Amino acid sequence: YMLLGSFLSPLRNKRTDEYGGSLLNRARLLFEVLDAIKETCGREFPIILRMSGSERDPQGNTVEDMKRLIPYLEQHGVDCFEISGGTQYERCNKIIPCHGEEEFTNLKEAREIKAVATKPVITVGKILDAKLAEDVLEAEEVDGVVIGRALLADPDFVEKAKEGRYEEIAPCAACGVGCVGEQTKRRPASCVINPLAGRELEFEEQPAKEAKKIL
């Protein structure tokens, strides 16, 4: 989203040399970085590229632009695509979708990119429902999902889902208050759902002395 994303985006890249203008020119620096990684680390070194499936701006890159770019990125050594959305500037709420955004925010673009890619495609963006995530994977809509904030809310999210204990998962509110909000203030991440998040070494989790039925 920062340097390489700015070069790739027509919203930010106003250069008139070989690094600006057309889609492939805007991607030139990214291609060079990918080539340098493979040259330095070896062809077997895996590269996962996180990219916006769509910048969601009338003047920005669209999913069609990204689909055109996929074969070139594979030629330059990308082994897996992680599909996000938006930009660091105009559509930051799409990068970290909050409670007003739909779940699986970038799934539509990820599906379209998977249709043209020969490498695995994974998606990220407000993936909060474990059962829905399993359904998406079982339907092979994408090859993988990336879960972030939901693991702050409940570090046992994956284990509970694996055991079918969906109702026991503490649900992420997608509020962005403790995780994103605290980081913007240069403070350690926390979570309004999980008071132990970011403080695991300060407090030891203890079982309740007496069980209570809340609802």
What are these regions (language model features)?
Residues 1-215:
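Flavin-dependent oxidoreductase catalytic cores
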